[in-house]
Amino acid sequence: MKTLQQFLNDLGARESGGNYKAFNKYGYAGKYQMGEAALIDAGYYRKISRRFNNDWSGKFLGKDGVNSIQDFLNNPKAQENAQIIYKKKQWGYLKTVGALNYLGLIINSILITPSGLLAGAHLKGAGSVIKYLDTRGKICEKDGFGTSIESYIKQFANYDVSEITGKI
């Protein structure tokens, strides 16, 4: 089984080609293509309005020396720290929505694993993951580029992410 570090490296490669300075047309930033909501969850950012549109008009909180989106793009250590914090937060969301009840099941020939769930949540959030699971794959949301949750759940199924999830 692959390690957490391999999971992060492979996720970063899938999201941005591993480019810490990547910034896409939807406003997602860095190696892991994190948006405003992700950086709020990781404790790096506060949104002024209620709308999450990745316009970065909120306030950076200075965590790890990050005071702007440019600081974030120029700080690989902050991006790695933010991703670990965010993954732990996502795991909590997945637990809350009941996604862990599906661990070990097979949906559309794909084994449901902790790392697959985390990858699916990275792409579209825990709410979209539970829709996929509850409908046994009939509702399979995609991101703005057409990438499906199912493809992430499958691609990232074989990693040991117990440093994030703890013992299950």
Language-model region placement:
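Active-site nucleophilic cysteine motif
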Residues: 29-35
